[in-house]
Regions:
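Carbohydrate-binding surface patches
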Residues: 233-269, 311, 369, 405-408
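Long intrinsically disordered, low-complexity regions that are acidic and Ser/Thr-rich
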Residues: 288-377
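Substrate-binding/active-site clefts of carbohydrate-active enzymes
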Residues: 1-42, 64-70, 87
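Active-site-proximal helices and loops of the catalytic beta/alpha 8
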Residues: 35, 41-44, 51-135, 153-154, ...
Length: 415
């Protein structure tokens, strides 16, 4: 070792601070399993990220998965894997997900080279490998240069963000990327990638924070973006469109990475006669009355819904006890009392919350479905609401005109 004292041990990558542990030793293995149990019991954590999972013993990860399933059925295991066949780690026996470094590379090089074929090929290839498993999608992290520094044209930050949230996978944001901050490795050090941030330093007119906020809302509200089948619809070096389809519904992403405007005629993935730009709809929900059935319902999405779902998720504790009474849940719904049928319907759904655990789960599920239906009605009532983009459905095609280096997320509906 560096002290030349005759003491040594195996390490990772030549770094003595990263000791290589003998996971075949029962005491070492049990120590790690009990550590997980401590964090679940003490802090009710929901998952673990395994650093350098590509060098961990497969047998240990299988045992870890089984152990965690016994602690918490929905416990999530995600591993850092750089290269290789991701399905070797992300499968029903080991990890739920791994880092999608292959797509990470395509996100910046596909834009720098004006080559959407690379990104489209990567998505299709990975779908064929991992199937229904959702990979951990990112454009940068604490180990790689910031996406802002990697992109030749900083305007491409917009379309990169859209891709992270709309392709198959689990989107993630590395702090600061929502503002588009730069960062490169310096002399082999990662510290320049991990700065302290002062929010007062960032320009409020930056469009990226609002875009990320909108994309996060859409990911929550439209299950097509999480569970929908992926269908490639349109592909050139400079333009790319795909759909996420679920139960006869579709959300279409259309992108233009060229420095000039683009006209796209995209085959419809479903029967539809109306196209709505979700990026604009979501940003204007609280200020344009015609984009929602009424203002109180719109505000309820931003205020009462999060409180309600937080309480609903805690209704049943680890030992099965009821933590909140129905009255507590009803308080979270006060903002939904609009006098409309929707408000009454939600009220009725929560009438029997105290009956049984099964009934509670059913009610919560029905509430989510009702909220999704209400949101869809609001979207359909909102009109095209385009913001510089042009959308039209004609002769079985979605006609999209996009400005330079911009994209849209479109909800297709059949009125």
């Amino acid at each position: 070792n560096e002290y030349n004292d005759g003491f040594s041990y195996d390490n990772w990558g030549g770094y003595n601070l990263l000791a290589k542990l003998n996971l075949w030793n029962p005491e070492v293995k049990n120590y790690h399993l009990e550590t997980v149990k401590f964090w679940v019991d003490e802090f009710d954590i929901d998952g673990i990220r395994l650093d350098a999972a590509d060098v961990l013993d497969f047998g240990f990860m299988k045992e870890l998965r089984s152990f965690c399933n016994g602690l918490k059925p929905d416990f999530w295991l995600m591993g850092e894997v750089i290269h290789g066949d991701y399905s070797r780690w992300a499968n029903n026996d080991m990890l739920h997900s791994v880092t999608n470094y292959e797509l990470h590379k395509g996100l910046y090089s596909g834009h720098n080279d004006h080559n959407y074929f690379e990104i489209a090929h990567t998505i299709k290839r990975l779908n064929g490998i991992v199937g229904d498993k959702k990979l951990y999608t990112f454009c940068d992290n604490h180990d790689v240069a910031r996406i802002y520094s990697k992109l030749n044209n900083k305007a491409h930050m917009y379309n990169v963000a859209i891709l992270v949230y709309t392709v198959p996978g689990i989107p993630s944001i590395y702090y600061g990327s929502e503002f588009g901050i730069p960062g490169n490795k310096e002399n082999g050090s990662d510290w320049n990638l991990r700065p302290d941030l002062n929010l007062a330093d960032f320009n409020e007119k930056n469009e990226l924070p609002a875009l990320y906020t909108t994309l996060g809302h859409l990911k929550q509200r439209f299950p097509e973006l999480t569970y929908g089948d992926y269908r490639e619809l349109y592909l050139t070096t400079g333009q790319f469109a795909f759909a996420r389809c679920l139960d006869g519904r579709a959300v279409v992403t259309a992108l233009n990475n060229a420095d000039n405007g683009a006209h796209m005629e995209i085959n419809l993935p479903i029967g539809a006669n109306k196209a709505v730009n979700l990026l604009t709809i979501d940003q204007s929900t609280e200020v344009q009355e015609d984009t929602c059935t009424d203002d109180a319902t719109a505000k309820a999405w931003g205020n009462a819904r999060n409180e309600l779902l937080d309480k609903a998720g805690q209704l049943v504790g680890a030992s099965g006890e009821i933590r909140y009474k129905a009255e507590d849940i009803r308080k979270a719904l006060e903002a939904l009392e609009t006098g409309a049928d929707f408000g009454q319907a939600v009220w009725n759904l929560f009438g029997n919350l105290n009956d049984t655990m099964n009934n509670m789960h059913r009610v919560i599920g029905e509430f989510e479905q009702t909220m999704h239906k209400q949101e869809r009605n609001a979207v359909a009532a909102g009109g095209d609401c385009t913001g510089g983009e042009s959308l039209e459905i004609r002769d079985g095609k979605l006609i999209v005109d996009l400005p330079a280096n911009k994209g849209v997320v479109v909800y297709l509906t059949n009125e």
